[in-house]
């Protein structure tokens, strides 16, 4: 051995004067490899989709691909999120509370305080970063919404872009929403134009499915045994609710019953399925109309449901069509995800893929009382009129609109709960759809679990399913402990105790807490979309499983 040869401490070969007597060692430079037979992982994150929307959760929107996953897995009837998109996605990917990782609110509302700075620390690594160090290929497709605004440009450091947070490939949009016909696309680390136009049959949901399949297939051609993690986040059902007319027309007449009747029909379906207990009662559609703010402000008109019986025929026609368009948007996107499932099945990967399906929060009330042909009006405190929307009635869902249904449908799609997205104090904001499937690893198929689960519990459970301890270091950085708790035991045994005892909620001035049996806590309502002032509500909220006594929480 030659002294001072520059040999690294990890090198276990031999360096001699004669190369014929030397032995190389490639170990220190080898790429990480996954354990034998490690499963693939697919996270499917829907947007703004309430628990009473899909047919497999009792709703009236047909979702055959989601039902296909549910039939091969477990539905969670007591799954909860953060009430808003960026925080939920941060909690999902890190296995920690959103406030732990600086994401107390969406990127657009972040402030220079530790829990709300919009920058996920590197000592709270994403699942993608951990799996990349364990031999997985990692792909992010669709909505991201975890990059600070000042980094969302080509001159930035891109430290919080997907490709800097453990994802090898990215195709999607950095912000919270985008046009589904003409999206703002980023491919890996640079902006690109859509590959086609709506006139050519382009829609973002199809494009995202194509890219998901492409990314997986490209790697499998080279390394067929290498597992992958795909984080797939379609724009559906966030506004704009864009879809081809023929898909909206599939629901012609489906919602003519109105949103109050929809709630009654769906509640009975939920009871029959076991999504809610048989003695569950509906909450009122306008539970806080009599509540005033500290200076006597009335409950905001933007957050008020117009009773269906108070509408004239033209208004009913418009409101029903807006729901048809939304339903068509979801079903079309479901069909594109079905293509991903078909590819996985045809390539022999489906049974050994852990699939996690969630919605990031409850249905959105951002359409205001009348719905809108331009969602941006809501964020500027402007309530769209029926007269304005009727001018574009035949264009709803097309490139000429940026549409959103009326708030009454948000209450309907969150049946049986109160309120909607943004409200961490009420189940309408935080009680959401969730499905977990892994045919080769989870014996339960087509079953429902009512164990209390929070979004931060998902990734700890996936680590548990993999037989993998949460990493102590990632990229050489010591990691903080996870906040979430694995519920793997409950997937096998519905009576299992997951060990979870407490979960807190906070969003834009609203708050709630679940503790063992669901202890209530005072609630405050969030700021109006056009301002940052909050208006207190009366009463209290509980995040427990609904019963006849507490279904209105």
Language-model region placement:
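Formylglycine-dependent sulfatase
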Residues: 1-540, 544, 548-553
């Amino acid at each position: 051995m030659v002294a001072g040869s520059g040999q690294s401490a990890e090198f276990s070969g031999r360096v001699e004067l004669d190369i014929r007597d030397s032995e190389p060692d490639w170990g220190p430079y080898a790429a990480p490899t996954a354990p034998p037979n490690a499963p693939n992982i697919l996270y499917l994150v829907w947007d703004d989709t309430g628990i009473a929307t899909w047919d497999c959760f009792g709703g009236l929107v047909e979702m055959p691909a989601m039902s296909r996953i549910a039939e091969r897995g477990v539905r969670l009837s007591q799954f909860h999120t953060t009430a808003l998109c960026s925080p939920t996605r941060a909690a999902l990917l890190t296995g920690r509370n959103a406030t732990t990782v600086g994401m107390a609110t969406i990127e657009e509302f972040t402030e220079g305080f530790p829990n709300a700075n919009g920058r996920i620390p590197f000592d709270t690594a994403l699942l993608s970063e951990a799996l990349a160090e364990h031999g997985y290929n990692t792909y992010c497709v669709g909505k991201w919404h975890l990059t600070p605004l000042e980094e969302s440009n080509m001159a930035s450091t891109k430290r919080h872009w997907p490709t800097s947070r453990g994802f090898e490939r990215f195709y999607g949009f950095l912000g919270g929403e985008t046009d589904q016909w003409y999206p703002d696309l980023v491919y890996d680390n640079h902006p690109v134009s859509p590959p086609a136009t709506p006139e050519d049959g382009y829609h973002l949901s199809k494009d995202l499915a194509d890219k998901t399949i492409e990314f997986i297939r490209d790697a499998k051609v080279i390394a067929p045994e290498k597992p992958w993690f795909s984080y797939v986040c379609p724009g559906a059902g966030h506004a704009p609710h864009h879809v081809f007319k023929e898909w909206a027309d599939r629901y012609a007449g489906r919602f003519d019953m109105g949103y109050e009747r929809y709630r009654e029909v769906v509640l009975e379906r939920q009871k029959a399925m076991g999504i809610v207990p048989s003695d569950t009662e509906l909450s009122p559609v306008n539970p806080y109309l009599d509540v005033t703010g500290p200076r006597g402000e009335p409950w905001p008109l933007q957050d008020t449901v117009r009773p269906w019986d108070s509408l004239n025929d033209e208004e009913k026609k418009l409101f029903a069509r807006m729901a048809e368009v939304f339903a068509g948007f979801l079903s079309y996107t479901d069909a594109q995800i079905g293509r991903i499932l078909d590819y996985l099945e045809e390539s022999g990967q489906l049974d050994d893929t852990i699939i996690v399906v969630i919605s990031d929060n409850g249905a959105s009330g951002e359409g205001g009382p009348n719905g809108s042909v331009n969602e941006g009006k809501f964020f500027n405190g402007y309530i769209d009129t029926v007269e304005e929307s009727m001018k574009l009635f035949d264009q709803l869902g097309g490139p000429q609109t940026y549409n959103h249904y009326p708030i009454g449908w948000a209450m309907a799609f969150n049946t049986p709960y109160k309120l909607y997205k943004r409200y961490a104090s009420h189940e309408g904001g935080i009680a959401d759809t969730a499905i977990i499937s892994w045919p080769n690893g989870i014996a339960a198929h087509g079953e429902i679990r009512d164990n209390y689960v929070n979004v931060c519990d998902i990734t700890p459970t996936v680590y548990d399913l993999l037989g993998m301890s949460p990493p102590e270091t990632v990229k050489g950085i010591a990691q903080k402990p996870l906040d979430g708790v694995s519920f793997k035991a409950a997937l096998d045994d519905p009576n299992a105790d997951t060990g979870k005892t407490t979960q807190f909620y906070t969003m834009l001035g609203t708050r709630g807490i679940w503790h063992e049996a669901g202890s209530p806590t005072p609630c405050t309502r969030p700021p109006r979309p056009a301002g940052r002032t909050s208006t207190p509500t009366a009463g209290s909220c509980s995040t427990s499983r609904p019963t006849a006594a507490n279904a209105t929480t």
